[in-house]
Amino acid sequence: MNRLFCIAMFAFCAGFLSAQDVSWPEIGLDAKPAARWWWMGSAVDKENLTRNLEAYAAAGMGTMEITPIYGVQGNDAKDIPFLSPRWMQMLQYTESEASRLGMQIDMNTGTGWPFGGPEVGIEDAACKLFVTEYRLEGGNTLDQRIEVADKKQKPYAKLERLMAFSDTGKCLDLTDKVKDGMLCWKAPKGSWRLIAAFCGKTLQKVKRAAPGGEGYVMNHFSARAVKNYLGRFERAFDGKFKDTAGGATAYPHNFFNDSYEVYGADWSEGLFDEFLARRGYKLEEHLPEFLAAGERSDKTRRIISDYRETLGELLQENFTRQWTEWAHRHGAKTRNQAHGSPGNLIDPYATVDIPECEGFGLSDFGIRGLRKDSLTRPNDSDLSMLKYASSGAHIAGKPYTSSETFTWLTEHFRTSLSQCKPDIDLMFVSGVNHTFFHGTTYSPAEAAWPGWKFYATVDMSPTNSIWRDAPAFFQYISRCQSFLQMGQPDNDFLVYLPVYDMWQEQDGRLLMFDIHKMARRAPGFIEAVHRINDAGYDMDYISDNFIRTATCRDKKIVTSGGTAYKALVVPGARLMPADVLARLLELAKEGATVVFLDRYPEDVPGYARLEQRRTDFKGTLEQVKKLGNKQGKGKTVFFGTDYVRTLAQTAAIPEAMKTSFDLSCIRRKNPEGYHYFISALTGKDTESWIPLAVPARSAMLYNPMNGVSGKARLRQKDGKTEVYLQLASGESAILKTFTEVDVQAPEWKYQTAARGAVELSGLWNLRFVESAPAVHSVPDSVALGSWTDLSFEGAKTTMGTGCYTTTFVIENPASAQDWLLSLGDVRESARVRINGRNVATLWAVPYCCSVGQYLCPGKNTLEIEVTNLPANRIADMDRRGVKWRIFKDINIAALGYKKGTYAGWEPVPSGLLGPVRIIPLKITKNEMQ
């Protein structure tokens, strides 16, 4: 009796667990899309804050990040100074309203960018090296003042070193011999070159600053300057301004820092001393090499590499780490864009709580049917660039990677939701799982259309026409991110970032790794990343510091963040610190796999103790090569120039969906097995059995566009698990595998077109449910095509939603197992109703949906509400001279930061272009085993 009861209970629980395992993950707050929320002039009020937040919440957004910027012309009286008591009251109200609506608030630790403002005195402002040189013959004294040549710097520049270099190679430090600007020194015999190094100021002001945020950019290399800067926030949040009413305001969920754009900041006070402490020799004794122009010697390149490494360490320790620790003390976390920094990007990304990458421009994958626009710019952030942030998160064990999403995909007012999908899919396969739109602007109800706007943005706001159907897009993001935030990363390889090669090879002194120049900074590394990806593998980058702390467990390399990898790959690095190579040797001896592609490292970076370090390096390299030459079982070091053949010798299995089917994907692991996000970022359709790199007993497919799921078809062939997959160009899917369990769930509907498709040609009824400016005299019946080609008033200028209606006859809907509605070319999104019932919102190619359950025998009524872009309306306003560019500072700039209007734009196609077809479907049987 008891035994039977236990068996029955086990069966019940197993069935229950299976039902739970196959469901969609719960969509948490962080899985919902977030957005940068610009406060223009911080001219906010409670009524409009509530209005804005309610619109965002209703559409499905989760987090709003407040970034105050410049204000609106003629609105100065309503501007609220940043961090003033009134500003803190508005923040407090915003946090309260967000909580009421189930949202959360992040905020920029400043206004505009980069960090700076009125509290940054000149002593804490960003610094720049200035050099003045003098010539002096032996026996003479200098009758010139030791001073900076740049007149603007005279009030600020401080002498750091005065060094004398003779023609015979002598070097003297004369700094202590300068009194009141005059050198008290008689030159010994010979010809002398005197170099005076001054710590001056960049005088850069905060870019796009808000009221109360204007001022100098701070010195990110100075611990004192950063501490002083953060002190202003503590006083504001603790309510310590003397006229603060209402007490302390809660710290935000996250503090944010935008990309590092501290231009020309190549120095800091005390840098000579920091350099000596960190690099082991005096930089000032090598100023002739450090300042040398033209062709550089190896010595010069090594010294400059050491200088670049020192700047990176100062930024990491004095800014990134201090800022993050400060936020933690106040119960907040940090979100940071490290790109643009002068250091090894992996380390600052890994230091913060949420590393953030940035897309800038539009990617073109050749997706079939996707609209093209001439007014775009190519995306500077490919997969290789986006992976810096996710790599930092993965190797450090951080759960989220965020993204500044959709920065300047197209010219303003011309970006469709369909154009957004490929680039967000690219971010997903690159490791992003917490997207932030760039962005949306607080806009009061009384602001005339288009409302308050920020340049360089997709404008994901309620005043944009794409907002009408954006909730469907937001649902897509939330569904994807619910999976992408689940489990842990499962990338195959760690790939060594050869930053010392970059530091040594690149010209100039200050080297900033911004996204727009990475193709020039690291062409070899970028090529290697794409070759590894094309070979079917996925990877995270690793820095020297993280290699130093990596361990070997069960023949896998485990980072300090707890993430395991099957091998560490060194792609063509010429320079490597001796201790890092030694650590790779130790890992290999412990059973971990290390792969050298193209070449073994050849030398150590840096200048100090060069020969001793070279000796250590060469001894270690000989041992590494000895392991690489070993044959047979137990080999742990591999070398090769053929990426595919060499990587195939590791324990990692390539994903055939990448190598054979041109699909993009990312794989994560979970307690039941693995899950993939897969996107057809290609012009080809896919319908095939696809081998997986992981074993599975069963699997589920999930469609993030509509929430449909079902049990996938699997088979075992040639020792591999294969899944049957159907993906059209531009489509995406989520696949979840179960290693041990055969889950019980309805089967995924694999469908193919049957004969008997019907094209709904002829005339359609057209009426506008929304239009601005309002349209008049719309024809009762129209052929499919752009409504801008029609002759009614406002056809070429309106922004709105046109409802297309037609009827069609299907005598026996049951004659097919399902029916597919294909809308063809849609400009730009569509809501579908059949027989008065809502069917779907279609916002991306292919514009298709299943409609079988909505059909009835005989006559059926089809309604399609199509919403266009605001481009035609804004162009008309420019032609009529309507003043809507009412913002201070840069106001509204066109692509490339150019001034101009949209008056010359041709009408952008709008409406339902078709062809529209009803296609009978048959569900294929599982006969392909």
Which functions belong to the PLM regions below?
Residues 1-21:
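Bacterial Sec-dependent N-terminal signal peptides
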Residues 69-177, 185-187, 191-194, 198, ...:
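Acidic/aromatic-lined carbohydrate-recognition and catalytic surfaces
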Residues 691, 808-835, 843, 862-866:
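Aromatic-lined ligand-binding clefts that engage carbohydrates, nucleic acids, or primary amines
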